[in-house]
A protein has these predicted regions:
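Short, flexible helix-loop junctions that flank or precede catalytic/ligand sites
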Residues: 1-162
Length: 162
């Protein structure tokens, strides 16, 4: 994840005291397949889907970007335009941590990702899994595809968004 960039650089021998001057932003991304807009199929969310998505959406920053309907997601079907796959193209699920005074101070004293995420709380960062969950509800990708690429049950991630 993006906060893990700082401990990894320190582990590689970069001096923690210069990270603040050397970095402006840390970003992590995973590419997910984009649902084919010609053949995707709407389906209601089940209790199992809610069990996965609800913790991600509970405290999500920028709620205004969520679709009005939070009870529907989309599945791949397959057609001539997508070669029968149900997917056509890719899109990134991202998370970005800006280097600011709080992050710089945190990195100088600890290399704990939990502490870095706590220091970044004021930035209202949408975690990669949360960005993907929004894309699932918008019909951009499927929950199956998102869970293939992003760990939706990551303990640190779930703890830091709670």
């Amino acid at each position: 994840d993006a906060a893990g960039t700082f401990p990894r650089l320190i582990d590689m021998g970069v001096n923690a005291d210069i990270l603040g001057a050397a970095l402006t932003v840390a970003m992590a991304q995973r590419l997910v397949r984009r649902l084919c807009p010609n053949c995707r199929v709407a389906t209601p969310l089940t209790a199992e889907h809610h069990a996965i998505l609800d913790p991600l959406l509970k405290n999500i920053p920028h709620k205004d970007e969520l679709p009005a309907n939070l009870e529907t997601m989309w599945l791949p079907k397959g057609c001539e335009k997508c070669g029968g796959l149900g997917y056509k193209g890719r899109i990134a699920c991202v998370e970005v941590v800006l280097m600011d005074r709080e992050i710089e101070a945190c990195v100088r004293t600890t290399s704990s990702e939990r502490d870095i995420w706590a220091a970044a709380k004021h930035q209202q960062i949408r975690r990669m899994a949360q960005d993907g969950a929004v894309k699932v509800l918008q019909g951009v990708t499927s929950l199956i595809e998102l869970s293939r690429v992003v760990d939706l049950h990551d303990e640190v991630m779930l703890e830091t968004i709670a």
